[in-house]
């Protein structure tokens, strides 16, 4: 982070607003896909952002690549876990066939459905659960747009697998999956710090954002939940301090809830 700050980090910042997901994806592919350091990747993504949808997606992509290191880093993926537990859409299950792994069922929340190249899914439950990476163009996968949710610029969708056969080579390791919830928050917080570092008019707030990012980067490989609680307090304070002095951030008042919403769960958990 020190090297990034000492260099002219504003050199590649967008010259104007990026209002469409496809535009931010193209920008991300050009300037960030080759970044191997996932903490810097999330932070830089936040610096390039001008709204919270891009902050979320920047952190989300680093979290996915952290969790599933087998995944390519040069395009977007979506980790689809949610299912219709109370409705009529059956959840995703699998069976083994001579041709490979047969998938049938639905995933009800796919982030960045318009841009993602790969959908990562959990199929089955309990001891039967497996994780697979499926190309968005699979002939037996249907992706349907749904009404946009909590971040208006981010596309969302539903995935329907109907007799979709995938190779066992598409199986992913689940060794880091249990940590995804925590990891996702940390990378999104990093992206938020990047947003504040590049958009705040207050030099003290900017300094704080860089310092907090350093702290967060040290936690992505740590299991110290108390430290996460401490850094969450600092991130929420940063959010309060940054409000009112941000330049060119679309939807700040409405969408800062993205950062606020994680805090209650973090602070209510035991150490």
Please tell me what each predicted stretch does.
Residues 1-42, 105, 186-271:
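Alpha-helical interface subdomain recognition
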Residues 64, 161, 196:
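Alpha-helical metal-binding/catalytic segments enriched in His/Glu/Asp
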Residues 111-113, 142-143, 168-170:
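Short helix/loop capping segments that flank catalytic or ligand/cofactor-binding pockets
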Residues 160-190, 200-207:
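A glycine-rich, basic-preceded beta-loop-alpha segment at the flavin cofactor/substrate interface
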Residues 1-115:
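Glycine-rich flavin
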Residues 139-165, 174:
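Flexible, small-/acidic-enriched active-site or ligand-binding loops
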Residues 89-91, 128-131, 156:
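Short, mixed charged/polar active-site loops
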Residues 104-137:
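DPxDG-like acidic metal-binding loop motif
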């Amino acid at each position: 982070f020190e090297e990034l700050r000492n260099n002219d980090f504003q050199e590649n910042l967008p010259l104007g607003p990026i209002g469409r997901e496809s535009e931010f994806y193209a920008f991300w592919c050009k300037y960030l896909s080759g970044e191997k350091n996932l903490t810097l990747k999330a932070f830089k993504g936040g610096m390039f952002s001008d709204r919270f949808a891009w902050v979320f997606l920047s952190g989300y992509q680093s979290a996915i690549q952290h969790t599933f290191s087998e995944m390519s880093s040069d395009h977007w993926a979506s980790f689809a876990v949610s299912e219709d537990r109370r409705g009529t859409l059956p959840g995703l299950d699998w069976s083994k066939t001579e041709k490979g792994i047969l998938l049938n069922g639905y995933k009800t929340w796919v982030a960045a459905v318009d841009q993602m190249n790969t959908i990562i899914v959990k199929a089955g439950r309990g001891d039967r659960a497996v994780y697979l990476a499926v190309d968005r163009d699979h002939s037996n996968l249907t992706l349907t747009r749904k009404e946009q949710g909590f971040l208006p610029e981010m596309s969302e969708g539903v995935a329907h697998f109907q007799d979709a056969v995938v190779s066992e080579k598409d199986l992913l390791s689940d060794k880091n999956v249990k940590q995804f919830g925590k990891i996702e928050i940390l990378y999104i917080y990093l992206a938020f710090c990047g947003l504040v570092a590049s958009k705040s008019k207050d030099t003290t707030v900017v300094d704080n954002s860089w310092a907090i990012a350093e702290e967060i980067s040290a936690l992505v490989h740590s299991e110290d939940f108390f430290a996460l609680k401490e850094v969450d307090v600092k991130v929420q304070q940063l959010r309060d301090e940054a409000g009112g002095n941000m330049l060119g951030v679309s939807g700040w008042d409405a969408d800062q809830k993205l950062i606020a919403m994680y805090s209650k769960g973090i602070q209510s958990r035991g150490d």
